Amino acid sequence: MTDKPVSVYFTAENRTFWLHGLFWGLVTLGLAFALRMLEWPCWQNPEYRLGSEWLLATHDAYHWVAGAEGFGHAVGHPMAVMLRGMADLLGTYPAAVAFWFPALLSCFVAVIVYAWVWALGSMEAGVAAGLLTSLAPGFLARTLLGYYDTDLVTLFFPLLMTLAPACWAMRYMLLPQLILKKLIVGSGLAAARRLWGSSLAEQDLRLGNPLRWQWVVLLGVSGVISWWTQEWHSVFPYLTRYNVCLLAFMSLVMAPRGRRNLLLLGSLAYALPTLGGPLFFGFSALLMTAGWTRARQMYRLRQWLCRPWVLILLWLGVGSLFLSGELLQTITHQLSLYMKKAEVSGGSGALALIYPPAGQALTEVQDLGLLAVLAYFHPWHEAAALGLLGFVWVIFRRPGALFLLPLAALGLLSTKMGGRMVMFGAPIVAVGLTLPLYWMLQRLLRKLRPNVTGILTSALLLALLVAPFVNI
């Protein structure tokens, strides 16, 4: 539990370490659910029921309930299928599941954010990050009891499907500051060589085998999940392609000396299933065999796969999958729906009624000012702004956080793309508040153990930024 990415411990058989992680994850889940249930007394009004059934909060929720019941346009959609499956499993009706499930899944979003902060540097500080995300106004308002809609999964899946690639990248790739040091050392300055030369060599020596079967399985499964999410929402095809491009870019730019081809090969374990589906998980199985370092035949296979012309052919295949379908046309169409002002329509004649554009009339797609956007990240503008600035620091120290960059962009683009995007900024601000505070406390309180510092970080953030807004 030191100031290192959790991926460093992936190869260690440290049962206590992982049990501690499970414990704090359950604490995050329990606290998030308890805080979410503070709204439960408000539902005791009989007017909020229809017979024995609670009324759902949005028309979209009834859209998915209808699909789960077997009629309407939502039949066969994953949201309706999931609702039907959970209702059958629990022996109840879809509308009851649609009422309770938003509060439950939003708690698992808190757990995923906790896991991200754990991976980026501190297990215990992740508790505060998870709760800050779960209770962020922009996410909370769209995931209250009865709000069964795609907002639940559009934040959950991007956090889930990128966690393993981020950990893998941080485990086997160079940190940005290390790259800068190498550039300075390579410039020929004698003082720089004396200052950093030995430390650079030591950090290169700790890098292990990026094709270990555990990593390959995690990358492959994350890729299949990424591919599957594209059936849930139109935003996922863009996010998955960004993730593939980022992993390839990091393998090219941040690879230690002599390991670029090996990292490009390992990145394919994620890229191919992400773009091609479960069928390409077979390539991950091939990489698992190539990762066995003790077998001479497997070593030869790995050497052959790492040849430049083989990698070029494989990545050309990734490129063809990347551009398959009418991707560019779809992207242009989707952006125009969000960003272009629709023309006002109406009838002819002097007394004709003038109708506002339907899309721009909806609250969730109205453009917001920057201060309004910050208020959706956290009720205090100053805290939200500090979180955004802190996230920049996190990116510099933990390049795996680059996988979260699209969420930051979507959150800030609420000024042009509408208020429904604000929830994407919640985990960004949470990460940007917790980790920098944890690192600063480590510097100030050097005698404290890292786990105690993490607990102190969570306690301070919960007392200052959560308790005042939940009447604790």
Segments (PLM) and residue ranges:
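Membrane-interfacial, low-structure loops and terminal tails that flank and connect transmembrane helices
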Residues: 1-18, 172-221, 263-267, 296-310, ...
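Start-transfer (signal-anchor) and selected internal transmembrane alpha helices
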Residues: 1-48, 127, 288-319, 454-459
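Membrane-embedded helix bundles of polyisoprenyl
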Residues: 28-35, 101-116, 125-200, 212-253, ...
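Short hydrophobic/aromatic helix or loop-helix immediately within or flanking a transmembrane segment
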Residues: 60-93, 100, 104, 151
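Transmembrane alpha-helix segments characteristic
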Residues: 214-222, 261-269, 307-319, 383-416, ...
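Alpha-helical transmembrane segments at the extracellular/periplasmic loop-to-helix junctions
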Residues: 238-245, 279-293, 309-403
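Hydrophobic/aromatic-rich transmembrane helices and adjacent perimembrane loops
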Residues: 281-289, 410-448, 452-455
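Signature aromatic-anchored transmembrane alpha helix within multi-pass, membrane-resident enzymes
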Residues: 308-317, 437-471
